[in-house]
Regions:
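N-terminal Rossmann NAD(P)H-binding glycine-rich loop of SDR-like oxidoreductase domains
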Residues: 3-23
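Short, polar loop motifs at secondary-structure junctions
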Residues: 29-36, 152
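NAD(P)H-binding glycine-rich loop region in Rossmannoid oxidoreductase-like domains
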Residues: 34-90
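Conserved Rossmann-fold NAD(P)-dependent oxidoreductase catalytic core, especially the SDR/UDP-sugar
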Residues: 82-125, 139
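Substrate-positioning beta->alpha
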Residues: 129, 177-191, 202
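Conserved beta-loop-beta element that borders a ligand/cofactor-binding pocket
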Residues: 135-156
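Core catalytic loop region at the nicotinamide-binding pocket of NAD(P)H-dependent oxidoreductases
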Residues: 145, 196-208
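A conserved pocket-lining segment of Rossmann-fold NAD(P)-dependent short-chain dehydrogenase/reductase
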Residues: 164-181
């Protein structure tokens, strides 16, 4: 498959590129600076400058954008909506590296992880931004999007186990009662989702088995 990874130089983006390349996919990294990924093909271009023409030849576009500072958090909504506009009305799938804060913790889907008293205050702005991103996506019936939430403990340097549980809108715990996944295992789940073609216009979540 022809896969575009946007913001590919980030830690999640690089591992997703690596996983897809190792499985034999035709991957193009879209980066702002020098290509630091395993992809042989790279395009230096800001996300907000990408056009429909830039993305038309791909089967799947992965939005791996990440922002953590107050002045850049709005980029989560802005970048994913810009990509939606570029892909509107096409068959190109859009997969977004999402967050865990917006996962629900009750069957009624009225309480989210970030609403709990134990949720770290420092992460509330990021969780809020990614939650808004998801809500905006839910209204995009013109795009084949999938929002992929990691576990609550998303470990950049965690172990690559190759085993994960696929969940949905609710926070999922493994047999050890943990909500944890490494970036490497998340990349496996992301490429599995690309290959399966499931969960169009849905949010899914992944946790280490």
């Amino acid at each position: 498959m022809k896969i575009a990874v946007v913001a590919a130089n980030g830690r999640a983006g690089k591992l997703i590129v690596k996983e897809a390349v190792e499985r034999g996919h035709d991957v193009t990294a879209f980066v702002r600076g020098e290509n630091q990924t395993a992809a042989e093909k790279a395009v230096q271009k800001d996300i907000m400058d990408l056009t429909s023409e830039d993305l038309a030849s791909f089967d799947v576009v992965i939005d791996a954008f990440g922002a953590w500072t107050p002045e850049t958090l709005g980029g989560h909504v802005a970048t994913s909506q810009h990509l939606c506009d570029a892909l509107s009305g096409t068959d190109v799938r859009l997969l977004i590296v999402g967050g865990a804060g917006s996962l629900f913790v009750n069957p009624e889907h009225t309480q989210r992880v970030m609403d709990g008293p134990d949720f770290p205050e420092a992460f509330v702005p990021l969780a809020t931004a990614q939650g808004e991103e998801l809500e905006k996506l839910r209204s995009r019936n013109d795009v084949a999007w999938t929002f992929v939430s990691p576990a609550a403990d998303f470990q950049a340097d965690g172990e690559r186990t190759g085993a994960y549980i696929l969940g949905g809108e609710e926070l999922t715990l493994n047999e050890a009662g943990e909500s944890v996944i490494s970036y490497a295992d998340y990349a496996i789940a992301m490429v599995d989702e690309i290959e399966s073609g499931d969960h169009i216009r849905q949010r899914i979540s992944v946790v280490r088995k």
